[in-house]
């Protein structure tokens, strides 16, 4: 919005041209989302407490989690508001990629909101029925996937980028839609599974978003894209603004979500953030890079799949409890130790992922 306004004002005063600089807008996008999140935090927490919208804790979970009962949840609303407002202010709104991410963010946020509402307000422990949750996730993902395919059909925007191989970039055709669907829905649910400890999901989300901000900048720059042997995608650079907004909103939320948490993001936050990261990865043609940088989310998801599969096939569990962060809790690790070690692993994976861009 401000980009459009600055274009007109620059005719009167050239100083307004600063709003056209991507680096400037990326920084202020981060700061705007951070300030909004920090400002909303105390008000959101107080409002949720008045409405008695508190976290539901399973009886079969770790005993250390029983003290979390009643902690305000659905705090992901403030993350989404901060991101959306910041992006609307600082991004070029004529860019279709920006709207694709915002659609997933808002749509998955709505699905998560209904799920949280049923759990904590209507006291329905199951929340939104799984098949309906999956149905709406699928509808949103397919709408966005077909939109993205129609925009970039038969261009580098629909090629498959394989790490370590600079000349392997096949055109996917309609397989692009299937891959996009799988990545968006899968990442959404992976982040949701990871969100089980104070600050555990939000910091890896921040790290991955920061990594994708750098990738988006390179992908949208013809010279750097050529240097790194990745596809040059014309609309990609504006995703930098989306990524930095996620970073700012995430850091602001962490202020209140760090151990011991004053508020949880709930499904409204985790489903939306995961869906947004998946969408960004697809738009940048970096699905494999997401697997590396988002390795914490991948491992958390695999631990659940392996646990369920092992129990059904052999009647035995592999882990003491899944997702795997609970396994380490039950082994006696204090919660802060689990959280910080997962953060360290996440940061390492993001750096490794970025390094693979040059190893081709």
From Swiss-Prot:
Query: Keyword Cell inner membrane, does the record have it?
Result: yes
The keyword Cell inner membrane is assigned to this record:
yes
* Coiled-coil segments: none
Question: What topology does the record note for this protein and the membrane?
Answer: Multi-pass membrane protein
Question: Which cofactors?
Answer: Mg(2+)
| A GO term, aspect molecular function | phospho-N-acetylmuramoyl-pentapeptide-transferase activity
Task: Please state where this protein is localized.
Answer: Cell inner membrane
Please provide the Gene Ontology terms (biological process) for this protein: cell division; cell wall organization; peptidoglycan biosynthetic process; regulation of cell shape
Under the cellular component aspect of Gene Ontology, which terms does the record hold?
Answer: plasma membrane
- For this protein, the parts annotated as crossing the membrane are 27-47, 73-93, 94-114, 132-152, 168-188, 199-219, 236-256, 263-283, 288-308, 338-358
Pfam families, sorted: Glycos_transf_4, MraY_sig1
- Which PROSITE patterns did the record assign? MRAY_1, MRAY_2
Catalytic activities: UDP-N-acetyl-alpha-D-muramoyl-L-alanyl-gamma-D-glutamyl-meso-2,6-diaminopimeloyl-D-alanyl-D-alanine + di-trans,octa-cis-undecaprenyl phosphate = di-trans,octa-cis-undecaprenyl diphospho-N-acetyl-alpha-D-muramoyl-L-alanyl-D-glutamyl-meso-2,6-diaminopimeloyl-D-alanyl-D-alanine + UMP
Q: Which UniProt keywords apply?
A: Cell cycle, Cell division, Cell inner membrane, Cell membrane, Cell shape, Cell wall biogenesis/degradation, Magnesium, Membrane, Metal-binding, Peptidoglycan synthesis, Transferase, Transmembrane, Transmembrane helix
Function as written in the Swiss-Prot or TrEMBL entry: Catalyzes the initial step of the lipid cycle reactions in the biosynthesis of the cell wall peptidoglycan: transfers peptidoglycan precursor phospho-MurNAc-pentapeptide from UDP-MurNAc-pentapeptide onto the lipid carrier undecaprenyl phosphate, yielding undecaprenyl-pyrophosphoryl-MurNAc-pentapeptide, known as lipid I.
Q: Tell me its family.
A: Belongs to the glycosyltransferase 4 family. MraY subfamily.
Please identify the protein, giving its name as recorded: Phospho-N-acetylmuramoyl-pentapeptide-transferase
